[in-house]
UniProtKB/Swiss-Prot annotation:
Protein name: Pentatricopeptide repeat-containing protein 2, mitochondrial
Ranges for the PPR repeats: 159-193
Organism: Xenopus laevis
Cited InterPro entries: mS27/PTCD2, Pentatricopeptide_rpt, PTCD2, TPR-like_helical_dom_sf
Keyword NADP among UniProt keywords: no
Location relative to the cell: Mitochondrion
Primary location class: mitochondrion
Length: 382
């Protein structure tokens, strides 16, 4: 009971008076406070919605017995007992506060020490732990564990690294995201399509000599291996080259994009033309965009106000061309083809159909599928 007492005391200090366990999770249930500002990875990769569902299912199964479960695991740690795979899975899905995660860290170290030379099917704990850290804004803990040499092999999948890079990217911690990328390379974890997207996005945001070297190295590696540069990664790389005033390089990168029929690609192309083509060519491009048939079935090109301003600035010294530009600008405006979005916002935009909110899990579902009773009377009350 001494073990239980110390654990309970610790949790009470952290949880401000011992709120109901399920109410605590319900309050953090739309647990992605990042949802409105999350940019790059979709829920198909992050799987936060699926993770939240599993958490609620686990909490429902042992409702009222979380302390006892944590006591049982603590007792195993004290007795040097073997931590089973399903026990760690359950533990991670029960965590709802930072002290819970701190306790889970101890269990992870023990579990990995016991099982680092044993494979248990295809299950990987790394992504589960990273989703937990993403949910609770614990990027410091996630980064520390990911870089810890004693846990080599625990985070052996690219998804764990991608989730952490995405978390750091949304928080503007670009230098630390580079640390994750370097650590991923040091641990010889194979880069995925999403890794490249995140890597070029971070380089674009940093816009410094070091990120320029990283970007160049990655582009050279992709060229050597013959891999296909993901479209979103290519857009970031081209935009980064424009930031660096390497206009021909931006044009070369852009030429590798297979499908350019998007608002982002059209704006990138316009900006590249502004810096590499004649102003006559730029005007022809814009005039062609206003010359559509008017059919609702034909998608009209849409341009960023910011990018158009760059084009207009270039034409200021040429009165005749600038007059033509103003005429085209007015036609685009009248047709609703000018967007307030900046190029940066277009780059960091995730399509709505690929973005799922986690909040609806608790907000929309009011009735239990099993009992047809209100969830207010079961899961969410003290």
């Amino acid at each position: 009971m001494a073990v239980l007492g110390s654990w309970t005391a610790q949790r009470c200090l952290w949880e401000n008076g011992g709120r109901s366990l399920l109410r605590a999770v319900a309050q953090s249930g739309p647990c992605c406070s990042h949802q409105a500002k999350r940019y790059l990875l979709t829920d198909d990769i992050l799987k936060l919605h699926e993770f939240q569902k599993k958490k609620l299912a686990t909490l429902y199964q042992i409702y009222g017995k979380k302390d006892l479960y944590f006591q049982m695991i603590e007792d195993k740690l004290q007795r040097n007992g073997i931590i089973l795979r399903d026990e760690l899975k359950t533990l991670l899905h029960l965590c709802s506060t930072q002290p819970d995660v701190e306790f889970a860290k101890r269990v992870i170290y023990r579990y990995h020490a016991e099982n680092k030379n044993v494979m248990f099917g295809e299950f990987r704990f790394g992504p589960v732990f990273l989703r937990l850290c993403y949910e609770l804004d614990l990027e410091d803990i996630a980064l520390d564990l990911l870089k810890d040499q004693t846990l080599r092999g625990f985070f052996s999948d690219c998804t764990s690294f991608n989730i952490l890079m995405d978390m750091l990217f949304t928080k503007g911690q670009y230098e630390r995201a580079v640390e994750v990328l370097v650590e991923m390379r040091n641990q010889r974890v194979r880069f995925s399509k999403d890794t490249y997207i995140l890597a070029f996005a971070v380089c674009y945001k940093l816009n410094n000599p070091n990120s320029c070297k990283i970007c160049t190295t990655l582009l050279e590696e992709i060229e050597m291996t013959g891999d296909l540069l993901p479209k979103q990664a290519a857009c970031f790389a081209a935009a980064f080259a424009l930031k660096q005033n390497e206009f021909q390089r931006a044009r070369t990168i852009y030429s590798k994009i297979m499908n350019t029929d998007t608002k982002l690609c059209n704006n990138l192309l316009l900006l590249i033309k502004v810096h590499t083509s004649t102003m006559e060519d730029v005007l022809h491009f814009l005039e062609a965009a206003t010359g559509t048939t008017g059919s609702i079935l034909v998608k009209k090109l849409e341009f960023s106000e910011e990018v158009l301003a760059s084009a207009g600035q270039k034409l200021k010294s040429q009165a005749e061309l600038h007059t033509r530009f103003n005429s085209v600008y007015q036609r685009l405006k009248n047709e609703g083809q000018i967007s307030a979005l900046t190029l940066d916002q277009m780059l960091c935009y995730t399509s709505p159909e690929l973005r799922h909110t986690n909040a609806h899990l608790l907000r929309n579902r009011k009735i239990s599928h099993r009992t047809f009773r209100s969830l207010q009377s079961t899961l969410l009350v003290e």
